Curated annotation (Swiss-Prot):
Tissue: Expressed by the venom gland.
GO MF term list: serine-type endopeptidase inhibitor activity
Short name of any one Pfam family annotated for the protein: Kunitz_BPTI
Domain BPTI/Kunitz inhibitor intervals: 31-81
Similarity annotation: Belongs to the venom Kunitz-type family.
Residues carrying Pyrrolidone carboxylic acid: Q25
Name under which the protein is recorded: Kunitz-type serine protease inhibitor 1
Amino acid sequence: MSSGGLLLLLGLLTLWAELTPVSGQDHPKFCYLPADPGRCKAHIPRFYYDSASNKCNKFIYGGCPGNANNFKTWDECRQTCGASAMGRPT
């Protein structure tokens, strides 16, 4: 293979590595915790990552203490835990 062909192959492999989604093993451990509304009685809409479906879902947070699988926005949840962009809640 010529040096130009090798360079092209290297470039394509590098691009593929950059565009390939992060594997589940690279998610923060708290992404695998269940949704936890906490023991308080507030009614705060939040999102949690559901590792079984690879989606961020809505839940109602009570305000304290809960766990770290608790995000103010769907985008924050998806970016942190690597959820699928499909099935965005309305």
